[in-house]
């Protein structure tokens, strides 16, 4: 029973390198093609990849979405076909039909196995057809679910310009509507900001979240120079040496490394703005690095926690236990948030973790456990699902946050589950989305309580005696 709970002194890290299941990273196409409005995503893989995208995203091919499959066949794998000519034909067709500003090639497991030189092909083809081609190797051999976005943003980060003309400065980063669109003059707008080096935020989140976080920083006089990715490829933010960068998601370590090493940016190590506690710590870390004082953040956080609906949800979670099997790399941030809500985290499974990139989040998790008086959880990287199921059986948690592969089998054994994929697609960042995040977490608990009231307590029907 105590195998998954560490002593109160420090977080306990383990690595099992077992068989774990996550969503395929090529699923990042689902939200990135909508985020970058003038893009076209070409997934280079097999029919299996196509079936996955078609079913996972639920988009009918008749809708002509801005993504497509380049299906590899036997001739491609046996090197009997010319890869360059085939990809050129497809890209010319995309250019003719959709005329995108950028084409993103998504590499898959098959392109890795047959060693396709996508970068070399893209560089040659880009010069021939006149459209930028970004290559991202989002294969399931090397990456977990959300790391697909990480590979795309890391490739796009290298395309960000260092210097832009003065007249372009306002349109870069996709924030001109927030800062300039409603103002008659630039001088009046500049008065509300402190003077500080450029700040770029990286991570793909829905437009309402972009607006919320940008305006939260604006309240403290912090100007956001741009977001990566921007809504349009031509609006990628300028990143010159010395630009400060900060992430909004814990799975973007490769992007952070690229920005620091290739673009000579300065990374702000901060917790991630998930939940009011994380959002407050995120803003404080940015302000501290930029040397800007903040006011009213503690009151803003308390206001969110004291909202009647948030209080009701927290009361429902208080004293309950949660177990993370690991899927989307949001586990550390969600665990910290749920500990603050009064839950006990028994184990945090996570497919991959960069301890340097998540250092501030880990420190906040540790501090939150101490303040709430609960044991610090064991963090298991690359968890072995068989071993995890044995631990779940022994610990009997009130809630298991897991990938879709294990949800129904666990439910059939009387374990309450929540799909981790829902947190990936939901709006969970910032002060304003706390209620939505808690609604997601508590939904299976409220559902089970409602079913229990109806007398429906078992998922599997017992055989009737004859």
UniProtKB/Swiss-Prot annotation:
Name assigned to this protein: Light-independent protochlorophyllide reductase subunit N
PANTHER family recorded: LIGHT-INDEPENDENT PROTOCHLOROPHYLLIDE REDUCTASE SUBUNIT N
UniProt entry tagged with the keyword Metal-binding: yes
Family the entry assigns: Belongs to the BchN/ChlN family.
Substrates-to-products reaction catalysed: chlorophyllide a + oxidized 2[4Fe-4S]-[ferredoxin] + 2 ADP + 2 phosphate = protochlorophyllide a + reduced 2[4Fe-4S]-[ferredoxin] + 2 ATP + 2 H2O
Chain positions recorded as [4Fe-4S] cluster binding sites: 24, 49, 109
Domain of life the protein comes from: Bacteria
Presence of keyword Cytoplasm: no
GO molecular function, one term: ATP binding
E.C. number: 1.3.7.7
Coiled coil: none
Source organism: Synechococcus sp. (strain JA-2-3B'a(2-13)) (Cyanobacteria bacterium Yellowstone B-Prime)
